[in-house]
Every structure is written in structure tokens, then in C-alpha cells.
Amino acid sequence: MDYQNIIAEEKNGVGYLTFNRPKALNSFNVDMHREVAEVLNLWTKNPDVRCVVISGEGRGFCAGQDLGDRVVDPNAEAPDLGYSIETYYNPLIKTIVNMPKPVICAVNGVAAGAGANIALACDLVIAAKSANFVQAFCRLGLVPDSAGTWFLPRAVGHARAMGLTLLGDKLQAETAKEWGMIWDVVEDAELKAKVAELAERLAKQPTFGLSLIKKAIHQSSNNTFDEQVLLERDLQRIAGRSEDYREGVQAFMNKREPNFKGR
């Protein structure tokens, strides 16, 4: 299917979603939101897509909301920004978090505002050395959205989350890695190849089990210790009944490469 604001491709078990509004630093307008939602919903249900990569075309990953798509007339009634969050941004973040397969974010250039927090919602973030993350909301008198106030303090701690969100300073990729906010940093010229290699590696793994791991890690933030070990028990019970578990054991015993199906 042809899209105006994104590029969607499938290759070797991986779905590649590229934000494609480079002249606007891949910032979101309503049409782009709708296209992204359509593709991610299709891939969530498609068993042939076993890993998803989200990236941005051009010199930046995503600058968040396209302010030109939301002109504020000082003489008009104030806009309801909560509607945009409820209708578009929150469903997008929930789709990424709940997707039953790994989601990798490849960040080149700037990831600002909602763009930074979309990256944080992904399971693994790989950034180019030139990349940076900016919680730009404070510069406009706004509050971080797209679950930024949930992900950020859990990733970097209270003090650093406060500093990043109150000051709106750029956080360079290598510092983001040192702080535990992202998984890895690579040379700019190697970003695409390194991410594709990692995505294809994950696509060959037992993705049903990986989806249960995602669930366990996400729920650990709010669970008590006792609740978490019970969750591990329940998820392990489910995993142990999967076809992938049987295949993994048989492959190990027979000293061959496993052929996982994601179920």
C-alpha cells in the first residue's frame, strides 16, 4: 500500500516503518498518525512480521508534533491538546508497548518532544553517534506526553528526568547510553546495517516467548516482588506450552539450529 507520510516495507521477517516527512523533521500531522497506526496495527496481527523497526528519513528521527498543523490563533478558543494525546499519541505508545514482538527504534539526528518519547517506548533503541534527545515541551509551556513522564524517570532516575524535562537540553546519544536510556550507539554510516542485523536476529528468535518477556519487564515497574514472581510463574507456564519451546528443546538435544514459528 502506498503512503504519503511514511514508508512501510517487509523484509526477512522484519517490518520497517520509516517516518517520511523529512522537510518537517518527520514531525506528526494527523495524516501521518493515521498511516502509522494503520501499519502498526496490521503488523501486530501479521505472523510473518516478527520484528518491527521504526526510523526516520533524512536528517532527523522525529521532531514530535508538527506545530504548523496546530496553529494557535490568539483570538480563538484555546485548542484541546488533550484530544490529540487521547486520540493519537497514547494509542501509538500503547501499540508499541503491547506489540507481541520486538520493536527497535533507530534514531538518527534529533528525537525531540513526542519523537524522543516514541523512541523510549520501543524495546531497543539504537542511535547514531550524531543523534540527540530533547524533551522540548518545556520550551512551549507544555508537559511531556507520549508516556515520557513514565518512561524517563524509570530509565534515568528522578534527578536526571527532572533536569531533562525542566531544562529541555539536548542529550547526546553517547550520554543517553551511559545513563541507561538507550541500548547502543553506532557510527552514523553503520546505523541502518547494524539495526537490520539486530532485527533479523530477533526475527529468528522464539518471538512468542519474547512477547512474554516484554510483558514481564513492563509490569515489573508497578508490581510488588510477590506479584512479580507470581507473574513469572504464570508466564513461564504459558511459554512452556508453546510450540517454540518444544522446538527449542528438540533443536538443542539434536544439536541443530531451531526453526521458531512465533507460537
Would you name each region that the model predicts?
Residues 1-57, 94, 192:
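Conserved CoA-thioester-binding segment of acyl-CoA-metabolizing enzymes
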Residues 17, 21, 36, 54, ...:
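Terminal peptide-recognition signature
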Residues 22, 46, 73, 99, ...:
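Generic structural signal for alpha-helix termini and adjacent loop/cap motifs
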Residues 34, 56-95, 111, 141, ...:
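Glycine- (often His-adjacent) and acidic-residue-rich active-site loop
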Residues 94-210, 233, 237-242, 247-250, ...:
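Crotonase-fold acyl-CoA enzyme core
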Residues 214-223:
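Short, charged, surface-exposed hinge/linker loops at domain edges
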